[in-house]
Amino acid sequence: MKKTIAAFLITIMAILPSQAQQKDIQVQKRDTFEFSFDLPIYVEQLKHELTYPLAWRNCRNMTFDVWKQKARAKVLECMMTPPKAATSFSPEVIAQEQRNGYKALKIRFNVNAYSRITAYVLVPDGKGPFPAINLLHDHGAHLYIGKEKMIKPFGVSEEVAKDAQAWAENLYEGQFVGDYLAQHGYVCFSIDAPMWGERGREEGVDRSKYDIIAGNMMMLGRDLCGFMHYDDIASTDFLSTLPYVDKDRIGCMGCSMGAYRAWMLSAMSDKIKVGAAICWMVTTDVQMSTADHKREYGGFANCLPGLRQYMDYPDIASLAAPKPMLFISGTKDHLFPVRGVKQAFSIIHGVWQSQGADDKLDTELWDIPHSCHKDAQLKSLQFFDKYLKPGTTASSITQRSKKQKSKSNK
């Protein structure tokens, strides 16, 4: 019950301004208006005009490969001008520590020509190369930490360490996803998205400034959300160059905004062979709904200008077909109404079915809130093992877990 309440509070944090912000707001109202509940009052008319002409379901007059090429090109166009590519990644290990069955590294590298960033990398003990997972952190209206939500940090301030642990307790049932997967033989990798963690504001964290910064980026002809996706693609390219990584066995995973990043990365990068997205899938019709009293809460975090004129969320995610994909959503997730999730899953299945690959697509609705608890992490591990470690069984996962617990208790 406590975990359910904690997960619900995280959801609320993403929706409501702080009490201090509320006090500062001086509301002046006119008798007439054109926006209500943060949506235009003509939202239903606008949605009716969205026909999604580049969705696979509306492009059956061309081959799947031609559609994929055209649709990807449109997504890239809507991501706007990319950051200039780095001439080299120039990686540098700046810190490391031995953990239970794996080594934790901090690596600095050039993700693009403008940004040299820090990544956490976990490398299993033993002889590689190993399969690898690019772990994509959530939003949560909490920007102070990013990669530290996915991999237990080290060599950081006490404040960062405590914040990361508290976040893991709330959204991930006390288990860092990266450390869990590393114990089961995966190289795990995570970076901060722009605006999170070590890529935030010099003046300090202020969620209200995110949209202002995103608007300023647009004035420069760039899109902040697009930069996030370009960085996810580039960081996967970097991950594939590491000597202990099998470049043909790379997956990605995330929860909430991390799930959105995961299916976007799966759709846009051929280096990703399998993906897992926990608690982020819906149709625009339900996401922006007066009937469901719903609207988008992430702001510019998942805003690619103009893209909705061509494809809906499930259509974009379907660019990942026919590779293996796992989607888990929650019936108690207040951000994504079940009927919208079911609509999206139906569209996605139609694409995989058209390619004779529906057996590689797993979409599940669990009785959970907005979260990525241990059961979801186990399911993701099993899914990764199935496609990145053929021959692995559920019993072998159990045996590995017992061995790790035994080592921890010594």
How should these model regions be labeled?
Residues 332-340, 370-371:
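Acidic catalytic loop of the alpha/beta-hydrolase fold
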Residues 346-403, 410:
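C-terminal catalytic histidine-bearing segment of alpha/beta-hydrolase fold enzymes
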Residues 20-103, 111, 146, 397-410:
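N-terminal targeting or regulatory segments adjacent to alpha/beta-hydrolase or S9 domains
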Residues 128, 135-230, 240-241, 286-289, ...:
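Cap/lid segment of the alpha/beta-hydrolase catalytic domain
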